[in-house]
Amino acid sequence: LLVRGARPLAGAATRLSPRGLSTTNKLVLTLSAGSSSIKFGVFDVAGGAPVERCSGIVEEVGSDHSRLKLVVDGEVKRDVADLHIKGHGEALANIRDALAPQLPGEIAAVGHRVVHGGASILGPALVDDAIVDEVDACAALAPLHNPANALGIRFARDTWGDVPHVVVTTCVEINILRR
């Protein structure tokens, strides 16, 4: 995984590899927050190639019909409908609580999909406060996703603050298409 410094345009690239993660079972959590849902996955990277261990979704965030689905090693472990999950913070707390007893190790890194990072986040970037501020600043470019993306990053940093967090922006695809 190639990770650029806090300001990708200004810093040299550094390498963050699964071998550099600090747990026995090297697990990477991925989050993709949208306007009314959050998708998540947990991948074991101890053996090199990522192996999906858990995945799921919280749907209909903000409604009386919210749903949480959790799949562990290909088996549905939890599928609860008609929850009343008021917002993304509550949805992320539900994800954290549902994942905790299922994980075969500790989260060693967190990856965040961000829809638009503006002109400053043009590739994968190690998260710091400036990166989160930039995601917020680009809310007008992706109003249904960036606010939820920033909230997800803040929540995850509060929950798993002692591990690296990386944003990957889909605007990279736009830059590729322009070439």
What are these regions (language model features)?
Residues 1-24:
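N-terminal mitochondrial targeting presequence
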Residues 28-30, 109-111, 167:
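Short glycine-aspartate micro-motif
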Residues 31-36:
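A short acidic Gly-Thr/Ser loop motif
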Residues 37-85:
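Short glycine-rich, Thr/Ser-proximal phosphate-binding strand/loop in the N-terminal lobe
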Residues 73-113:
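Glycine-rich, N-terminal phosphate-binding loop and its surrounding beta-alpha-beta segment
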Residues 99-144, 175-179:
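Short beta-strand-loop/turn "lid" adjacent to the catalytic site in phosphate-handling enzymes
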Residues 135-179:
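Active-site neighborhood for divalent-cation/phosphate handling
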